[in-house]
Each structure stands twice: as structure tokens, then as C-alpha cells.
């Protein structure tokens, strides 16, 4: 049953929490219809809705504030109990000026199996909880009057589906939290001509001062595709091509005398972005226009160092699970995301490792603008099977392609701490699976580093990422000061965990400590790593000692501190769940800058 909430609470949720922004700044169209807001909602624990015709005759009594899941306060429901099937319903009308165009229904994310009906007609389904997807609903809509949109989301507690930090038990445990069911990112409509731009993959090359555009279009032979590149409002390049096939590739020289250095690079210190507009014309009429942007930056590895724009970069990252108290995995607003980014930078970190969450694209957009580095990490499965392999691989490839153009993303992390591959140390099948994901990732993105198993038991990784929650700085330093015993698998670095899986060895990759710290203040409930501290002075002493120990290791090229905020029962954040600083931000910065 739905938790009873009074009208005042529901109205407050709808008024306070709204997602009105265009959901994908990397591929923005000016004309769109936001479907966020109040929908009708129902639980279907007995899975009887399809049999009983709910899709054709929706009669749901409860309101829900989309895109917030029923588990959140922001939804207006706020019930943590797991429900395997949930239904949504709302109406929409086609604007008069859009009649005659294709009607595309888009979901930025919905967890886990999403089924869609329009006016009682089944449209299709999507499997996966993190990637965006869409349906062409043109043939099912009425051009005048109201259209009925019905959505069913099916979730489970299966460990074969990528679930990240969502619990698979009825209660929270360890570092796993309340599940995330159904629509959790923006839903919207776009109205497009049959001739349209489907996608553009943008690959910068700072060594040749050029950028490669991989276009995917639906166009006839008499169409023309224009690309206009500008920087800070000044046009840098413009060119046109005649599409002679659905997929085309063009490389463009970006050197321009309009700019002081002829080309502007993207970096944390100077996050320069080029704006780009793509226009598709049919018979000299603009039939589609998309706005995007890109950053000229390069990520590479040489001599045990990660290079950004051909220069070594020491990464000081913060583990960020992307949870909010009242909205959980759904960011409450642009302002909330920007607050996290600005506080991260204010503490002297230059990036985040988005842990077990594929983040909202508007967060990535803000990182692109602010110069905050991002490691993008897949949500884990927790058992190994053919089904898990298929689920994981499909969704990971979707996410890589969806997030490829963001310059702030500099590392891909498909696996963490052997989750989903629990016997990887010796199991050849599990080892081979991680290798296959590595090479598939490289086939889509040859440049960015891929960390196959963040924490331990690496197979093939471009960065050797190790986790260690030792709370005494001197002990931490002594463990790592001579790198060979750990990197040659002579000794484990984390209890019984070794750096490499059996049969694999160190090849000179960069080494980073990618989880450490996790210090919690004394708390009557919840947990952190190691002994809890009572005062700011105790916290800073430990933080300084363990951070300085890592920075004193000449072969270690960076670190990831756990973590930015408290998350439910895990209370080891530098900020509380409501983003109140536990320690003065400048004092954390002083240690990071030291």
C-alpha cells in the first residue's frame, strides 16, 4: 500500500522539487516538452496490471512527482518498502505548431525494465536502469485532444542486474542503501522532422589542433548538414557537407587567428569550451538544429604518469556517490549539483570519482564548465552469470556512448572491488569477462584510461587503483614506500586482497590510492572506516597524516578520499547529507594543497 501523505506534504514536494532544465546539454534542441511534474501512480505487487488492462484504462489514485522515485520524500510518497512493479500515467497534447512532425518520447533514465503505452497501444520497452532511451510514438498519438501516456516500471532484487549501491535486501546493510525504482530522471517529448540529426560523436585532437565529428543522421540526398563552431561568441569554423549516407566522419582544423593562442585547451585551470551548432537543411529550410559543445583536451599515459594535455597531472579526487537526502539518486536541481561541485573545488580537490552511479548529464555539463575532473564508474552487478554479463555489457556500452563527449570525464571504471566478479583472482571466465569489457571500452574510446577493477585484483588496467583504509599515516607510508612487494603480488595490500589477479602482473602503469580515509565523527548510529573521531582537531590530524603519507610516495600519482557526503547509514562524509560542512572547507584545502 502507498504510504499515506497529506495534501500539504504532496504539494510541498511538487513545489519544492522540480526538474525543469533541458536534460542533455550536450545535444540540446530549443523546442521540447517537459513531462516532469505530477503524474498518477500505483503499486502493483501482484503484477496484475497488464492482465487487468491498466495500460488501456488507467485509474491510479495516488500522485507522484516525477522524476523522483516513490522511495524519496521529493516524490510526495516517501516509502522505502520494495515494490517490484509500479505504474505511472499522465496526459499530454500535441502543440498545434508541432503537428506533422515525428513525436519522440525520451527517458533520461528509468530503473529497471520500462514499458510504455500511448492511448492504449503498446510502444515498447527498455531494459536497464542508467542509460537514456527513447521511442517514436508518432503512430499512436492523437493530433488533437489529450493523449494518455502509461508507463510500467519493473524492478527486482536480483544481483544479475546492474544496481550499484541499491540494496537487494529489505533493509539497508553495509554500504548499500534504499533501492531506486522506476523513473528517476527527466521524461520529455521532442517533435522532429523525418530528416534529423540522431547523434554526433566529438573527438578532439590537441596534437593536430583538430576535432573529428562522427555524424549519425537521417537525411535525403538533397539535404545539407552545417556545422558552426564558435568560441566565446566568435565563430571559429563553419562548413557544410551533403549527407550521402547515415553515418559520416569529418575532421576539422580548429586553428584560428581570432584567438590569442589560435586554439583553446580544456583543463581544470582553464575549462575552455567550444560551442557547436549542427543544422540540417532540406531544400534550404532548416529542419533540425542541435546545440552542443566540446573541450580540446587529451588524456594519455606515459612513464607511469597520467598526462592531461601532454603534462603530468596529480589527481586529488573525492569519492562522490551522488545521493541527496530527500531525492536520493535524482539530483534535486542544478543549484544542488553546482553546490557539490563548488564545495569539492573549495576543499582543494580537482575531481570526483562518481562511485557506482552513472551521473545526471547536467552534473557532467557543470563539471565541463567548472573544470572538475570526473571518473565515470558503472553500477555493479553482484553475482556472475551469463545473464549478468549480458545486462552489464549492454548498459555499459550505452553509457559510454552517451557520455563520450564530456571533456570532464577522463577515466572509465567498469568494475569496483571485484563486485560482480567475486572469484576473479583465479576464475578464468571472470578474468576474461573483465578483459572483454576493457577491449570493448577501448574500441569505443581509445584515449581515456580504463580501470578494469578499481581497488584490487586487476587484470588489465591502464591505472593500478588500490584501496586502503589504514588510519595511521606512518603505517600507510611504510606499507607502500617500496612499491615492488605490492605491485609484484608478493604481499596483499588490503587484508587478503592482492593488487593483481592470478596470472597478471604490473606493466609500469600509473598507481593511485583510489579509496582511503572514510573518517567518521562519533555518531550514535551509522559507520565510517577505522576509529571514529570526536573533534575537528582529531579529524584534521588523521586526515593530514594519511594524506601526507600518500603524497610522500613518489610513484603514486594521486588519491581518492572517501567521501564527499554522508549517505544514509554511512556517515563518513566531509559534508552531511544536507551539505553542511563538518570541517571548515579551507582547512581541508590546506592539506590537499600542502
How would you name each of these model-derived features?
Residues 1-354, 366, 374, 395, ...:
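Secreted/periplasmic carbohydrate-active enzymes, especially glycoside hydrolases
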Residues 341, 351-579, 587:
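Substrate-binding/catalytic cleft of secreted carbohydrate-active enzymes
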Amino acid at each position: 500500500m502507498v504510504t499515506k501523505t497529506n495534501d500539504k506534504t504532496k504539494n510541498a514536494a511538487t513545489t519544492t522539487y522540480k526538474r525543469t532544465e533541458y536534460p542533455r546539454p550536450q545535444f540540446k534542441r530549443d523546442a521540447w516538452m517537459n513531462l516532469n511534474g505530477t503524474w498518477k501512480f500505483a503499486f502493483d505487487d501482484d503484477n496484475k496490471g497488464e492482465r487487468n488492462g491498466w495500460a488501456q484504462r488507467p485509474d491510479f489514485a495516488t500522485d507522484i512527482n516525477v522524476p523522483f522515485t516513490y522511495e524519496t520524500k521529493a516524490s510526495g510518497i516517501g516509502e522505502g518498502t520494495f515494490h517490484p512493479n509500479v505504474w505511472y500515467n499522465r496526459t499530454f497534447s500535441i502543440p498545434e505548431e508541432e503537428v506533422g512532425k515525428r513525436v519522440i518520447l525520451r527517458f533520461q533514465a528509468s530503473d529497471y525494465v520500462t514499458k510504455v503505452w500511448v492511448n492504449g497501444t503498446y510502444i515498447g520497452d527498455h531494459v536497464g536502469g542508467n542509460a537514456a532511451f527513447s521511442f517514436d510514438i508518432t503512430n499512436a498519438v492523437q493530433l488533437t485532444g489529450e493523449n494518455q501516456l502509461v508507463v510500467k516500471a519493473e524492478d527486482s532484487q536480483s544481483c544479475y542486474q546492474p544496481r550499484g549501491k541499491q540494496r537487494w535486501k529489505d533493509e539497508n546493510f553495509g554500504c548499500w542503501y534504499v533501492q531506486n525504482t522506476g523513473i528517476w530522471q527527466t521524461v520529455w517529448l521532442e517533435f522532429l522532422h523525418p530528416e534529423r540529426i540522431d547523434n554526433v560523436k566529438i573527438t578532439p585532437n590537441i596534437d593536430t589542433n583538430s576535432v573529428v565529428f562522427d555524424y549519425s543522421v537521417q537525411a535525403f540526398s538533397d539535404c545539407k548538414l552545417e556545422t558552426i563552431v564558435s568560441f566565446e561568441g566568435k565563430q571559429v569554423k563553419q562548413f557544410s557537407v551533403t549527407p550521402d549516407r547515415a553515418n559520416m566522419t569529418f575532421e576539422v582544423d580548429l586553428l584560428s587567428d581570432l584567438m590569442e593562442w589560435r586554439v583553446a585547451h580544456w583543463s581544470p585551470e582553464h575549462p575552455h569550451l567550444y560551442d557547436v551548432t549542427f543544422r540540417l537543411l532540406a531544400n534550404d529550410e532548416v529542419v533540425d538544429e542541435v546545440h552542443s559543445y566540446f573541450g580540446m583536451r587529451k588524456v594519455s599515459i606515459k612513464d607511469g604518469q597520467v598526462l592531461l594535455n601532454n603534462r603530468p597531472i596529480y589527481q586529488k579526487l573525492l569519492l562522490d556517490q551522488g545521493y541527496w537526502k530527500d531525492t536520493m539518486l535524482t539530483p534535486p536541481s542544478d543549484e544542488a549539483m553546482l553546490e557539490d561541485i563548488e564545495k569539492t573545488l573549495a576543499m582543494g580537490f580537482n575531481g570526483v570519482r562518481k562511485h557506482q552511479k552513472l551521473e545526471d548529464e547536467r552534473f557532467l555539463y557543470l563539471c565541463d564548465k567548472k573544470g572538475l575532473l570526473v571518473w565515470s564508474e558503472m553500477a555493479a552487478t553482484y553475482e556472475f552469470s551469463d545473464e549478468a554479463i549480458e545486462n552489464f555489457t549492454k548498459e555499459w556500452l550505452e553509457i559510454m556512448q552517451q557520455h563520450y563527449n564530456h571533456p570532464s570525464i577522463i577515466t572509465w571504471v567498469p568494475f569496483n572491488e571485484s563486485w560482480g566478479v567475486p572469484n576473479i583472482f583465479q576464475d578464468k571466465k571472470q578474468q576474461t569477462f573483465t578483459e572483454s569489457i576493457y577491449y570493448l571500452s577501448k574500441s569505443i574510446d581509445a584515449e581515456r584510461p580504463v580501470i578494469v577493477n578499481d581497488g584490487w585484483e586487476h587484470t588489465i588496467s591502464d591505472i593500478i587503483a588500490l584501496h586502503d583504509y589504514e588510519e595511521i599515516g606512518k603505517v600507510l607510508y611504510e606499507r607502500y614506500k617500496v612499491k615492488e612487494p605490492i605491485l609484484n603480488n608478493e604481499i596483499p595490500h588490503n587484508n587478503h586482497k592482492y593488487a593483481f589477479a592470478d596470472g597478471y602482473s604490473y606493466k609500469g602503469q600509473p598507481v593511485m590510492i583510489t579509496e582511503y580515509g572514510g573518517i567518521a565523527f562519533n555518531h550514535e548510529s551509522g559507520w565510517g572506516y577505522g576509529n571514529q573521531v570526536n573533534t575537528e582537531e582529531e579529524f584534521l590530524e588523521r586526515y593530514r597524516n594519511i594524506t601526507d603519507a600518500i603524497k610522500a610516495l613518489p610513484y603514486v600519482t594521486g588519491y581518492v578520499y572517501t567521501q564527499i557526503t554522508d549517505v544514509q547509514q554511512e556517515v563518513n562524509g566531509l559534508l552531511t547529507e544536507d551539505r553542511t560542512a563538518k570541517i571548515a572547507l579551507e582547512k581541508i584545502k590546506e592539506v590537499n594543497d600542502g
